Amino acid sequence: IHGRAAAIATGAKIANPNLTVWQVSGDGDGLAIGGNHFIHANRRNINLNMILLNNRIYGLTKGQYSPTSPRGFVSKSSPYGTVEDPFRPAELCFGARGHFFARAVATDAPGTVEILKAAYNHKGAAVCEILQNCVIFNNGTHDAVYSKEGRAKNAIYVEHGKPLIFGE
């Protein structure tokens, strides 16, 4: 049911409002073929938790570029580089009138747990983007934030009611 996870999760939640629903999609699955479902799940703002695993590539199709691949990205499906700018999942979420978006890096377990707990406690649609590496087809895609040192230098941690701190 490629691309239909958000639609199925929405139906499950509407059919059983007491059910806690978590939906998991990749960046290609969730934002390309499932992009319209992602948009409407956010617009409807039902109590649904969406996890978007973003490795900037279709790993299961062996290296096809995805909606989040950067402009110029060379792959089997774009041998001369992609010509489009990538989707920015947070902008897409908020553009659809979504109320909750959080991002974590797969190598930061405490940060990932924190955003998943926040999503669970949020009433309404919640999107958690988790940046992942694809060691086979897109190795190093999130290097700027994948290591602890990289996160200290390049990541911004946002906490409600607290100041933003840039850099170390």
Where are the model-predicted features located?
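A short secondary-structure junction signal
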Residues: 34-35, 62-63, 104-105, 112-116, ...
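Thiamine diphosphate
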Residues: 1-59
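Accessory alpha-helical/coil subdomains and C-terminal extensions
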Residues: 121-122, 126
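Glycine-rich beta-alpha junction loops
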Residues: 55-57, 108, 131-136
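Short, hinge-like loop/turn segments at secondary-structure boundaries
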Residues: 41, 66-70, 144-147
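Conserved thiamine diphosphate
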Residues: 18, 66-119
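Short catalytic-loop micro-motif centered on adjacent basic/acidic residues
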Residues: 23-25, 100-105, 127
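Flexible, low-complexity linker and terminal segments
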Residues: 134-168
